[in-house]
Amino acid sequence: MNYYAIQVKTRGEEKFIRLFRALHPDCSIAIFFPKRSIPVRRKGVTVQTTPAVFPGYLFLETEGETLQSFHWQFRKTCGFYRFLKSNRNIQPLSGRDLETVLHFIKKTGPLAGISKVYFDENSRIVVAEGPLAGLEGNIIKVDKRKKRAKIKLDLYDDSFTIDLGYELIEKAVGLH
């Protein structure tokens, strides 16, 4: 399996997927658009929002040379900007980039939910389960009031931060 990243119009990712599927129903390439669920409080009411984990990026899962046959169909679809690294140098994801993308595609599923965490005796965050598991080293800041953890993600040469929600649980007595 090879995974590729494409850049599309930000906040137009779902529209691009619908349009591409309508124009090319015979395409067997899987298109992934990972999202995250975070609580947002507006005017005293907390609601769950689902923004993108990687705004403006979609990920393609291919087997063999199938991407080459659909290369121009992706480029001609409205909202498409470019393949990564570039349109002339299309390379599959590898190394740390692939690990980060697979964490959100395979481990957490299409929607990264709320992580269950607790704080140790040194006030450091410890993830019990959820999408933050495995990303503890990437946590930059923890906002206890908003119940969000800001993490740093790298994709190709670009580095950006996103917020993931967490739920505080009590540490069991037998755990370390």
Each model region followed by its residue ranges:
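Residue-level "contact hotspot" at macromolecular interaction interfaces
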Residues: 118, 130-133
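Acidic-enriched and Gly/Ser
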Residues: 1-124, 141, 152-176
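Short beta-strand-centered aromatic/proline hotspots
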Residues: 135-142
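Short, conserved beta-turn/loop elements at beta-strand boundaries and strand-helix junctions
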Residues: 130, 142-147
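Active-site-proximal flexible loops/turns
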Residues: 14, 136, 148
